[in-house]
């Protein structure tokens, strides 16, 4: 009874409040206990749960409470928090029954901070998740939040936190933030006032600036723009009803390629993900059915898929036998690692020191980058699984003047990097299928380094020179 009263008192959203009132009216005590007797756990990835009413669901109230805890902790950590500000981005998720959408949750997140005099960089439009950590670093903000559940089912949403270094938070930040949340669960004055987003002089829209500079940064890893403009290679892209379409189009343009052909049924945002059972591109051919069908119609040999918040990638390629090859993450890492090192070597001065070059992977990833590093002479490091660990290490290396060419899982360079990589692969006189180019090269390194985690084919095609 106490928890019911507390929730109804604190929740300012009529729809979620009504959900709890209906459960009380219908005597659904077990459901009430499940929803109200435990709170969301705040971890190093922030929050993630189903949308709906209750303390253990993602909703207006729990996001306000979490942001109040974030404010309290950041105020303790940064004496200049009110000067540096906070970044907020969001995807296109939403749930009608609880009046809960990523955009609304982002506005409430901003309102909590604006009411406390903190400048908020709130994107005026949905953005890919990588834009938020990029903006945190570029704008020198204290931290940032992305409202997204990435490739999860449509019922879910999340609250992903990034620290000042652009990486997801690590312990003990998560535990300290959770303590702060528990100390201030009652909404403050102004926390429900989402109109502050439109009226406060502390609200800033970073969309145009970040989009422009992000794409300019992408151009720095584009080594053959003139050749790219002349290619006839076609690409199909699906964004799985998420944020990716506009931004992948911009990324291809930055590299000089013709825009990829979008899958029309999946191009526009749709919080119901109505054409796929699971909006995760790593599920393989089962979720790429519309993409592969369009590719065959358009005579395109390469399909690129991004998940709903555009931070996860899948690539499929038509083989000589007429079948589609969907590359694994480890196979893509081998290709991207080879491509980035080859491009670095071809475009560096003679004085460039390979010992200043790094590639990183997590401990659960393939050892292929380690094999390439051993052969080519650059540094390879492993981190614990998770973008938070690899991101923090990349930041440390960059701050110490090192050059990080690639990290697996791949970061922002992956989606636009597909096009020049495949264009280069098809450039040789013998246009062997990328599967063979990949596995033959990987196979050579596996034999040399005692690795056996990728298949070695029985063919020996001509390889692009390293």
Which residues does each PLM region occupy?
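Gly/Ser/Thr-rich active-site loops/lids in small-molecule metabolic enzymes
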Residues: 168-171, 262, 322-342, 424-432
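Proline/glycine-rich low-complexity loops and linkers
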Residues: 124-125, 184-207, 318-409, 414-417
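Arg/Gly-rich low-complexity intrinsically disordered repeat tracts
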Residues: 448-449
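N-terminal small/polar loop signature for handling phosphorylated ligands or for N-terminal nucleophile
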Residues: 87-156, 251-253, 258-315, 383, ...
């Amino acid at each position: 009874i106490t928890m019911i009263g507390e929730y109804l008192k604190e929740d300012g959203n009529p729809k979620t409040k009504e959900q709890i009132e209906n459960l009380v009216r219908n005597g659904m005590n077990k459901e009430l206990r499940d929803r109200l007797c435990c709170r969301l756990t705040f971890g190093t990835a922030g929050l993630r749960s189903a949308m709906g009413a209750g303390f253990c669901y993602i909703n207006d109230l729990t996001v306000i409470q979490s942001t109040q805890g974030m404010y309290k902790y950041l105020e303790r950590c940064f004496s200049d928090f009110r000067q540096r500000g906070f970044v907020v981005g969001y995807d296109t998720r939403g749930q009608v029954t609880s009046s809960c959408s990523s955009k609304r949750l982002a506005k409430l997140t901003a309102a909590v901070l604006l009411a406390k005099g903190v400048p908020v960089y709130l994107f005026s439009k949905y953005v890919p998740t990588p834009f938020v950590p990029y903006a945190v670093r570029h704008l020198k903000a204290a931290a940032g939040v992305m409202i997204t559940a990435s490739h999860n089912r449509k019922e879910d949403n999340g609250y992903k936190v990034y620290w000042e270094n652009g990486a997801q938070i690590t312990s003990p930040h998560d535990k300290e933030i959770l303590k702060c949340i528990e100390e201030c669960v009652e909404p403050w004055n102004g926390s429900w006032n989402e109109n502050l987003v439109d009226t406060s002089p502390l609200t800033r829209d970073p969309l145009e600036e970040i989009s422009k500079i992000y794409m300019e940064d992408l151009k720095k890893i584009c080594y053959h723009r003139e050749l790219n403009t002349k290619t006839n290679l076609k690409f199909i892209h699906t964004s799985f009803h998420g944020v990716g379409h506009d931004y992948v189009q911009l990324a291809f343009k930055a590299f000089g390629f013709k825009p990829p052909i979008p899958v029309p049924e999946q191009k526009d945002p749709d919080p119901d993900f109505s054409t796929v059972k699971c909006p995760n591109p790593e599920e393989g051919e089962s979720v790429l059915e519309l993409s592969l069908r369009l590719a065959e119609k358009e005579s395109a040999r390469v399909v690129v898929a991004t998940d709903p918040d555009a931070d996860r990638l899948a690539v499929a390629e038509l083989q000589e036998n007429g079948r589609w090859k969907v590359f694994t993450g480890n196979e893509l890492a081998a290709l991207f690692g080879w491509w980035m090192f080859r491009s670095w070597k071809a475009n560096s001065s003679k004085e460039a020191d390979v010992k200043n070059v790094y590639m990183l992977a997590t401990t659960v990833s393939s050892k292929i980058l380690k094999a390439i590093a051993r052969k080519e002479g650059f540094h390879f490091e492993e981190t614990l699984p998770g973008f938070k660990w690899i991101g923090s290490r990349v930041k440390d290396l960059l701050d110490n003047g090192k050059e990080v060419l690639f990290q697996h899982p791949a970061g922002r360079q992956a989606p636009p990097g597909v096009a020049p990589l495949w264009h280069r692969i098809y450039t040789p006189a013998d246009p062997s299928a990328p599967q063979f180019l990949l596995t033959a090269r990987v196979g050579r390194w596996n034999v040399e380094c005692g690795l056996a985690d990728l298949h070695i084919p029985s063919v020996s095609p001509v390889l692009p020179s390293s």
